């Protein structure tokens, strides 16, 4: 048990779900189908507009062709390629190969001849089963030809030539998947693997003898195995459209053939109107990430299932129960055939607890044999049982392998799973990990959008920029291609501008694509999935284009034209030649992909060229363009200054105006009763998913309090799952947590006014911890989240007679003696907005007390927050750890500041202080400063204890050393994103003006916490 590092209760659940393993079904696929033919020979097995076959016809025809195959030497472990257009002939050929004892592999007749030849060579093919139109592809091979004419010939039920009978552990079929080297990999699936899975996945998907199953998938895609073989094994009817019907008349075919079961990709189903289909009863969505719009559109019309599977585990791995309209799009249901485990993607020997995201690995009888002739790839993907599994193996001497899917997922408390993403599908922008699927989800919810794709190209003019490509219900406008292809990318237009505006109401600015294109029809793979690689190629081939509406920098604006060139150069891959047509466009910097990191580089370039320092926040303004930045440079030069001084916003005036607005709310505010609610009311928490917010939430729930968390998510189910993922989550917290969908950046927190009023009767305390922390953005960009949201919450608390406590978590620079002094001293947008919001809370606290409203208000102001000594969970993006990492990297520190104090406290201590504010009686101390601190030398001492060699240097030497390091590594340096803060701090970590004390016991506690945090950062590779 020492190898099992999950909570014991989680391990017990895993054993309940995953032990014993599903039994291995020791049979062959064709034996199951032969049994159906014997039981119901006259029932239609395959229905099409070309020809229909009964089970007796199918079995007899396959038997005759199997005899031919055996005479040509086909026997167990021999592989037979099959090459057909959509027709019943392919189904006959599949069964014939199985009856002959061989294994089949499907070929796409439209594939490049080079790929067909590679596959033929890999499987060592000697004979091909095909139709006359494709004979020319296989001139060097023996051919058995099948045509619809053969269906009219008398069928035999004679025994085929005698060979070794098929065994359950013989190969049944091969599926080719893409390989990282460019050479496709062939997955070998045995009879027993498929039959074991089929015994579970057929009933889970409601496939039985009454099913009329649409054969939609390409023969080279594994979904066709379920559509064909599972249906035949269960005695159902395969409804097989021609390729023309599949592409141009699918709805008509479904209705004419009374199809009642189909598996479709989420992107393809958007092209079908469920009102046009009268016979469908069950639809399975699989093969791609399901969209919430898929569920909301179809859940009320059919029995909608969502599934997940891989070719390497007999196609189907999990299946959901029928969905309602509130089902999360990430839900993939329960295992069906094998069992699933969630492990650390970097180390499968580390099992992860329920709710934590990790790699899905699959165990059980459905796991395939491996990759044909590729032992290295097989060994990487099909692994031996991890150490945590050894002591529960049913037969340790004959233990089966597990398959690593390369997909991220998580277990839910009920034993179902969620699909999160493909490993590597997340991208990193401005240090934030972004799931492209989340952006796609929100875009797809716009009524103009049929389907969409968001990419971060790795090459071409648009590299490292978020690009959205949309297929709209409306027609595109100006083509960027030659107009000959329906998948030309098209310039953004009025519709995409509206969609972009819509997206800005759903996600933060950094998740809004910089470039928008439309396409007539997305290219698709044979499996009907969107062809993401093809779209990526289309984007990579596009040259960077400008938008004429932005205009051109005037020729006489030398500075502006130089800035425009610099901006354009930063957009292009290194070495790419500038297109003169876009070199001098006056493109908004944000539209040009200038983020805070690039803004710092641009600032340094301008400082070098013209000797003027432009604040980074100027580059980050929504209205910033080359011409506006050039005006700032000239303004500073005209005044003989080396720095452009931003016009100070009238913060005092804004503060006074907001105070007056809140005063009006206080005059009508009800007086609260001091009687306790007995735990029936909740605490409303903002920022609950953040670094500190998670600790606050854990502390509240552990104390038995009910909590309502404001969350920006696709739906409530997705919002709840964010907390299920946390390592400390317990099932008994479920009933204490409510999720309220909202967004601090939106008016009224993004909450409907009726819901806001209903919330007012259920909340006893408000903890406002949410904020947008960005040190380079201007106050106006942070205002909605940091100021407006605070005002809304204050008004909410004042208007509700049930709210008795309001706690605000402050931040920004050090506190002065008055609100006026705070705002005067604040230099960055974050400090300005946080301190202004704090001043509003203090104003309301004082006035509420004077009016005896019974509403206690307080402010908690922590310094740097670090993980406790027990867990050491550090926040690598914090200035503290970026500074420490720089010291470690350089091996030197500033000896002039060793006595300077660093205000620091741990997550548990800060959370306890905050909870205490809502638990105790109101007092006159409205601002609670968390006064723990360490001297800088204490931190350097901890580093030395851990074995790091550090050398003290003078302040001047330290500044020169760190500046040289930053100029050398630029965007890759730890402190580059916080360069402006580093300069404001005079390249220091602590402050000698801080007089906060620290008792010896607390000092040792904090030093232990520092040590544990550093060790954690080392294990993450940050230090």
From Swiss-Prot:
<dbReference type="InterPro" id="IPR042099">
    <property type="entry name" value="ANL_N_sf"/>
</dbReference>
<dbReference type="InterPro" id="IPR010071">
    <property type="entry name" value="AA_adenyl_dom"/>
</dbReference>
<dbReference type="Pfam" id="PF00501">
    <property type="entry name" value="AMP-binding"/>
</dbReference>
<feature type="modified residue" description="O-(pantetheine 4'-phosphoryl)serine">
    <location>
        <position position="596"/>
    </location>
</feature>
<comment type="pathway">
    <text>Secondary metabolite biosynthesis.</text>
</comment>
<dbReference type="InterPro" id="IPR036291">
    <property type="entry name" value="NAD(P)-bd_dom_sf"/>
</dbReference>
<keyword id="KW-0560">Oxidoreductase</keyword>
<protein>
    <recommendedName>
        <fullName>NRPS-like oxidoreductase fscA</fullName>
        <ecNumber>1.-.-.-</ecNumber>
        <ecNumber>6.3.2.-</ecNumber>
    </recommendedName>
</protein>
<comment type="similarity">
    <text>Belongs to the NRP synthetase family.</text>
</comment>
<dbReference type="GO" id="GO:0016491">
    <property type="term" value="F:oxidoreductase activity"/>
</dbReference>
<dbReference type="InterPro" id="IPR036736">
    <property type="entry name" value="ACP-like_sf"/>
</dbReference>
<feature type="region of interest" description="Adenylation">
    <location>
        <begin position="54"/>
        <end position="454"/>
    </location>
</feature>
<keyword id="KW-0596">Phosphopantetheine</keyword>
<keyword id="KW-0597">Phosphoprotein</keyword>
<comment type="function">
    <text>NRPS-like oxidoreductasee; part of the fragmented gene cluster that mediates the biosynthesis of fusarochromene, a tryptophan-derived metabolite closely related to a group of mycotoxins including fusarochromanone. Within the pathway, fscA acts as an oxidoreductase that reduces the carboxyl group of 4-hydroxykyrunenine to primary alcohol. The first step of the pathway is the epimerization of L-tryptophan to D-tryptophan in the presence of the NRPS-like tryptophan epimerase fscC. D-tryptophan is subsequently hydroxylated by the tryptophan 6-hydroxylase fscE to yield 6-hydroxytryptophan.</text>
</comment>
<feature type="domain" description="Thioester reductase (TE)">
    <location>
        <begin position="685"/>
        <end position="901"/>
    </location>
</feature>
<dbReference type="InterPro" id="IPR045851">
    <property type="entry name" value="AMP-bd_C_sf"/>
</dbReference>
<dbReference type="InterPro" id="IPR020845">
    <property type="entry name" value="AMP-binding_CS"/>
</dbReference>
<feature type="domain" description="Carrier">
    <location>
        <begin position="554"/>
        <end position="637"/>
    </location>
</feature>
<dbReference type="InterPro" id="IPR009081">
    <property type="entry name" value="PP-bd_ACP"/>
</dbReference>
<dbReference type="GO" id="GO:0016874">
    <property type="term" value="F:ligase activity"/>
</dbReference>
<keyword id="KW-0436">Ligase</keyword>
<dbReference type="Pfam" id="PF07993">
    <property type="entry name" value="NAD_binding_4"/>
</dbReference>
<dbReference type="InterPro" id="IPR013120">
    <property type="entry name" value="Far_NAD-bd"/>
</dbReference>
<dbReference type="InterPro" id="IPR000873">
    <property type="entry name" value="AMP-dep_synth/lig_dom"/>
</dbReference>
